[in-house]
Amino acid sequence: MSDFENSTPIKIKYDESSSLITDVFFKHVGNISAEPGGQIEFSSAPYERLSDLVENVTKGLKILEEAAAGELVFLSHGINPIAKENHPLVLPKERYQIMTRYFESAPHIRGVDMMRHSATVQANLDIFGDENWQDAVNLILVLVPLTQGLFANSRF
């Protein structure tokens, strides 16, 4: 049984100026939030098996798609293929406005593009315990290419 089935959304926040949901928390599962360019971020709880993560991400996407009721399109791309370079800031949070001003002062680093156009999967592989940390680090180094292969250009 999925964690989503045992969970009720217990916190929903939205930006009143845009009416966008900015944070949804599912107990024991993780957070679903919107990034400055409208990207969706899922910060999951830790999982022992990849299949459990995939199952819960799939169910989370279904919840988002149902909530969007056909009003939004979800793309599975690392970069927005249709946005113009001057893509407006979707979420008018103060921190994103501060970041925009900073990145615009250093256009050579393309920070505004990163904030508004890009999306990625960030996989965290944790080391449990200090006694065998060297073996754990070596295992993580072996798993990095596999992890990249699993998530490159993936819906997950």
Regions found by a protein language model. Give the residues of each.
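Flexible helix-coil linker/hinge segments at domain or subdomain boundaries
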Residues: 70-77, 145-156
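Internal, well-ordered domain-core segments that constitute the primary functional module
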Residues: 92-153
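Terminal catalytic/cofactor-binding subdomain
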Residues: 1-108, 117
